[in-house]
Amino acid sequence: QFDANIIETKSVQWNAGINISHNKSKILDLAGDEMIGDDDYGALKYIKGEKLFTFYLRDYQGVDPETGNAMWMDKNGELTNRVSQARYIKAGSPEPTVTGGFHTDVTWNGITLNVQLEGKFGNKVLIAENNYVQSDGYQMSMNQSASAMNYWKQPGDTNCNPKPVARNSTSSNTSTSTRYMENGSYVRIKDVTLSYSLPKRWLSPVGVNNLKVYASGMNVYTFHDVDYFDPERGVKGMGYGIYPMTKSFVFGLDVTF
């Protein structure tokens, strides 16, 4: 952690600070086992020598450009369209490698701007909800996401979802695969507050000691690449149906007599 007063004059004050932490965990022993499971949809494992939580998932390899079927890597390193033959791989951890924050306050002639940022880096998240809303035809009674419409339509199509088939007998939408895994790193503008304190010489004649007007926003914006409302998915990186962080905006008046 580092804090500094950058400018300190009668009319201008500016300070800023940053904090960074490195997170590291390792499972040393599992009472003789090399790996044991976790209850969360079978997606997480406790693996000796790895971080506390490790995603252990079927190895999804995209869409066959000729047929539109989902492809998987099998134990022999060969591609297959049968999910039952897909190999399982260690696919990263929901634990961030680095977490940090930044804050700064600038005051000029009674006007103050306060900004706070926070971030996490190096973690993976599993958007398990997508097996419902990008179901490739399995969830026929449920609305699908806009991204589900980007599916295979003709030979040669790539970088898309598998072709939708009624009831999806191929199980391409299984939640325990790398298909719905994403980089969970993000930077969030956690708080922005702009305030103005009226000069005391204006207030003294009316018996007011201090008067400040302000506007504040929380969770203003988040920079991330996760195909979901919010990249924060809980300690296990899944948080099935987790409610996203709420944005709030406040305008206020603070008066002291």
Which functions belong to the PLM regions below?
Residues Q1, N15-G17, G101-H103, D191-S195, ...:
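Membrane-embedded beta-strand positions in outer-membrane beta-barrel channels/transporters
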Residues N5-P94, Q134, Q144, Y151-K153:
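Conserved small-residue
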Residues I6-E8, I20-K26, W108-G110, G119-N123, ...:
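Transmembrane beta-strands of outer-membrane beta-barrel pores
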Residues S11-Q13, S25-A31, P65, A70, ...:
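Outer-membrane beta-barrel proteins
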Residues V12, P96-G100, S185-K190, M245-F249:
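Residues that define the transmembrane beta-barrel architecture of outer-membrane proteins
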Residues W14-A16, F102, W108, L113-V115, ...:
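Transmembrane beta-strands of outer-membrane beta-barrel proteins
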Residues D40-T67, Q144-D157, N161, S172-T176, ...:
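C-terminal beta-signal and terminal closure region of outer-membrane beta-barrel proteins
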Residues K120-K212, G217:
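Extracytoplasmic gating/loop element in the C-terminal half of outer-membrane beta-barrel translocons
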